[in-house]
Swiss-Prot record:
InterPro entries: Papilloma_E7 (IPR000148). Keywords: Activator, DNA-binding, Early protein, G1/S host cell cycle checkpoint dysregulation by virus, Host cytoplasm, Host nucleus, Host-virus interaction, Inhibition of host innate immune response by virus, Inhibition of host interferon signaling pathway by virus, Interferon antiviral system evasion, Metal-binding, Modulation of host cell cycle by virus, Oncogene, Transcription, Transcription regulation, Viral immunoevasion, Zinc, Zinc-finger. The lineage of its organism: Viruses, Monodnaviria, Shotokuvirae, Cossaviricota, Papovaviricetes. A motif (Nuclear export signal) lies at residues 68-76. The gene is E7. This is Protein E7. It comes from Human papillomavirus 9.
Amino acid sequence: MIGKEATIPEVVLELQELVQPTADLHCYEELTEEPAEEEQCLTPYKIVAGCGCGARLRLYVLATNLGIRAQQELLLGDIQLVCPECRGRLRHE
């Protein structure tokens, strides 16, 4: 500071000296790319569904939360499971 009051260029210069240290702060470390999604854990489920003839069918699956919800939607909607006896009858029709 040259006078009794600081001028704008002098204040900016002093702030730059405080903000910009002389040490090299650039990081040259390379990071390996990680998968965007974390692995979701598989949980065992037992699915009990009925065939059209009334037989009970059991399925055992490993699924994520999203996967078991999708399976539930399919079984309640567009997909129907059949027992081995009904499958045999369907083959001969």
